[in-house]
């Protein structure tokens, strides 16, 4: 009996699980947080001048893929385009004041609201 008792005492103790989890190698937050992006509907693409405010009537990219005010009908391409020059020159495209699916501006004036697209 004494031999069995001594064998039980000589057994190694069970391994204990660590109380604290290991530390993560990366911090939870990045050192510099990027600015929050405004909604996509109120922004133009980065190449076309950034964001456009709701009160400014909107802005259009050179390819007509920008944004206009909610009352407008979208963007239409400007008439004067140079295809030979490979420079990324900002070309003025107008916003239509009437909903239409055209690619060129029609109507009077050469402002942001030129009557619609045709």
Swiss-Prot record:
Expression (tissue specificity): Skin-specific. Expression was readily detected in adult trunk skin, adult arm skin, fetal skin, penal skin, vulva, esophagus and tongue. Not expressed in the cervix, rectum, lung, colon, or placenta. Expression is observed in the fibroblasts.
Additional remark text: Belongs to the LCE cluster present on 1q21.
Family, similarity comment: Belongs to the LCE family.
Induction: By UVB.
Record keywords, A-Z: Keratinization
Span list, region Disordered: 1-23, 82-118
Gene Ontology MF terms: identical protein binding
Alphabetized InterPro entries for the sequence: LCE
Composition skew (Low complexity), residue ranges: 1-10, 95-104
Keyword Disulfide bond assigned: no
The gene coding this protein: LCE1F
Pfam family, one: LCE
Ranges annotated as biased composition (Pro residues): 11-23
Functional summary from the UniProt entry: Precursors of the cornified envelope of the stratum corneum.
Species of origin: Homo sapiens (Human)
Skewed-composition ranges (Gly residues): 105-118
Name of the protein in question: Late cornified envelope protein 1F
Entry keyword annotation includes Hydrolase: no
GO-annotated biological processes: keratinization
């Amino acid at each position: 009996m004494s031999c069995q008792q001594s064998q039980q005492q000589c057994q190694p103790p069970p391994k204990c699980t660590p109380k604290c989890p290991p530390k993560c190698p990366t911090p939870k937050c990045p050192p510099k947080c990027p600015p929050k992006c405004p909604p996509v509907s109120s922004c133009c693409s980065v190449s076309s001048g950034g964001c456009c405010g709701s009160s400014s009537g909107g802005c259009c990219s050179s390819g007509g893929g920008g944004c206009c005010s909610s009352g407008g009908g979208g963007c239409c391409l400007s008439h004067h385009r140079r295809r030979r020059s490979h420079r990324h020159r900002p070309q003025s495209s107008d916003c239509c004041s009437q909903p239409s699916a055209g690619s060129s501006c029609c109507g009077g004036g050469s402002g942001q609201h030129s009557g619609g697209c045709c």
